[in-house]
Amino acid sequence: MTDITPVQNDVDVNGNNVNDDVSSNLKRPIDQGDPSNGLAEEENPANNQLHLKKARLDGDALTSSPAGLAENGIEGATLAANGENGYNATGSGAEDEQQGLKKEEGGQGTKQEDLDENSKQELPMEVPKEPAPAPPPEPDMNNLPQNPIPKHQQKHALLAIKAVKRLKDARPFLQPVDPVKLDIPFYFNYIKRPMDLSTIERKLNVGAYEVPEQITEDFNLMVNNSIKFNGPNAGISQMARNIQASFEKHMLNMPAKDAPPVIAKGRRSSAQEDAPIVIRRAQTHNGRPKRTIHPPKSKDIYPYESKKPKSKRLQQAMKFCQSVLKELMAKKHASYNYPFLEPVDPVSMNLPTYFDYVKEPMDLGTIAKKLNDWQYQTMEDFERDVRLVFKNCYTFNPDGTIVNMMGHRLEEVFNSKWADRPNLDDYDSDEDSRTQGDYDDYESEYSESDIDETIITNPAIQYLEEQLARMKVELQQLKKQELEKIRKERRLARGSKKRGKRSKGRSGSKNASSKGRRDKKNKLKTVVTYDMKRIITERINDLPTSKLERAIDIIKKSMPNISEDDEVELDLDTLDNHTILTLYNTFFRQYESSSGASNGLDGTSGVTRDASSLSPTSAGSRKRRSKALSQEEQSRQIEKIKNKLAILDSASPLSQNGSPGQIQSAAHNGFSSSSDDDVSSESEEE
């Protein structure tokens, strides 16, 4: 007989406290290193002991007779005692019986019905050596009930399940338990009928429930399985209880079985609202029933119309594309268009390497579907897909093959049709972009030119328009004043330059004089002055014959009343400014500097001024000079100039007819600038 020594309920053999309400976790094994373990460890080397049952024990003693052990659901003479059990198992069965008799005599015996609930303890049991097979999946489609729950109850239960699935605590229960993935191979040894939310939802969809109570039973089964396998105090068990409370709350509003389903009253379509109400009798006078009148469907339910673009230009383009595609798919081309009507199926056609060559497949059927769905925004997009069909054909089928030749033949048909594509520039993209119920689209129907601006009565707009008009007038006035100011400044600048030239005469360095002459020659005159008229009057008779004829032609063009044979009298006051400027800029610009030198402020002649310009005083008065010339240098330069003049006089045709004074004057007038350049250059060299 085994001697059983009672131990305090919350203290183990090592003196450690043990929780009274021990968890029934089915996966917790017995520690093999515990010296108080009474099981034969050599029989269970894999540590596969599990606690399966709880024994009711009191805080002081345990019934020691075999009958008492049987009452507690324990059979056998060997008990396992570890840190979580409330007793130790030692000795023989006879000693246990004697120990129990002594406790009964001392008044310490305890009956089974008086045991406290907090003294529950677990007893070990061996784990199965092989995992149990998985039960058949639910629902069984061959055994569905003939009278499932009504549709309105089914809908309410589905809504309740979907609401529970959205909870955070429902994540572990969404799908069936996978023992392989979760590494729990013996799950089906303890859970004979698994259940989860997706299985309940699937059973609802196929009509596997006859009454709503069966739905609740399956949900409770799922919760109980979790508590049984993980223990009542596990976190996942608490999550199961949370979603159970939420599910029960939803199921409280389950409608009755005979209640009619609630039909949601939708909004009547515009076509139904506009349709007149006509009362019709069931039968006419001859007894024949009338046909039921159904209102037409609303236009907004047609997907084709909703996808139709608002642009009239795009509609015309897609209409032409549809005609081209219809021609390509016509029966008259059936002998060579059939390979391109449908997508290529590499499996049925035994073309396993088709997609290795063709990365973007396309066919005429797909193009037709895209056209019907208005997926093309331009004609170029349609052309690109059609060209892609032929490109794929030529890529996969080499030249000379039958399909390649079919593709070329069909492409010729496409090219001939595509060459007649219309010019869509006449269609405005926003011309027809409106609908009857859309204010913005209706407003775009009218262009800005069709709106009468006189109907605008907003005072702010009118005030801004008045301000804008006044600012435009002020802007024009400011521009005019600025132009007058610029013209006046230019006139003053030209007048000051002329006066400065008259006072300074021909003084100045070579660079300054040459630059001034270059600017005058290159710059055309734009304003008629008195000097221009004087130069034209004095110099026009000195022009060569060819230039004189051209000048006369210019004058005649400005005076259309003069005939070809009439004699032209030059009166500058009768000529317009344009003609005077044309004559001056064409023939007399080069005489401006010489005229200023020949007619100075002192009234002396040009010969006197030219001679004085060659004097030492005149040469020394230049602004830019290296140093004053000596008397010998001045004499030498004068001799050089005289020699040049003599050479020019001897070569000039005027020397035969003109007087010496006239020749000298002409020479001085014609070559004064060159002599000045020589003087200035020599002075700088010195």
UniProtKB/Swiss-Prot annotation:
Disruption phenotype: Heterochromatin spreading downstream of the silent mating-type locus HMR. It holds the Pfam family BET. Residues 1-69, 85-150, 283-304, 424-447, 486-523, 594-636, 649-686 are annotated as: Disordered. Signal peptide: none annotated. Residues 460-499 form a coiled coil. SUPFAM superfamilies: Bromodomain (SSF47370). One of its GO terms (cellular component) is Swr1 complex. Phosphorylated by the casein kinase CK2 complex. One of its GO terms (molecular function) is lysine-acetylated histone binding. InterPro entries: Bromo_chromatin_reader (IPR050935), Bromodomain (IPR001487), Bromodomain-like_sf (IPR036427), Bromodomain_CS (IPR018359), NET_dom (IPR027353), NET_sf (IPR038336). Residues 287-296, 488-507 have a biased composition (Basic residues). Residues 594-620, 652-671 have a biased composition (Polar residues). Residues 145-254, 312-421 form the Bromo domain. Residues 438-447, 675-686 have a biased composition (Acidic residues). Residues 130-139 have a biased composition (Pro residues). It comes from the Eukaryota. CDD domains: Bromo_BDF1_2_I, Bromo_BDF1_2_II. Keywords: Bromodomain, Coiled coil, DNA damage, DNA repair, Nucleus, Phosphoprotein, Repeat, Sporulation, Transcription, Transcription regulation. Interacts with the TFIID subunit TAF7 and with acetylated histones H3 and H4. Transcription factor involved in the expression of a broad class of genes including snRNAs. Required for sporulation and DNA-damage repair. Prevents the spreading of SIR silencing at telomeres and protects histone H4, but not H3, from deacetylation. This is Bromodomain-containing factor 1. The gene is BDF1.
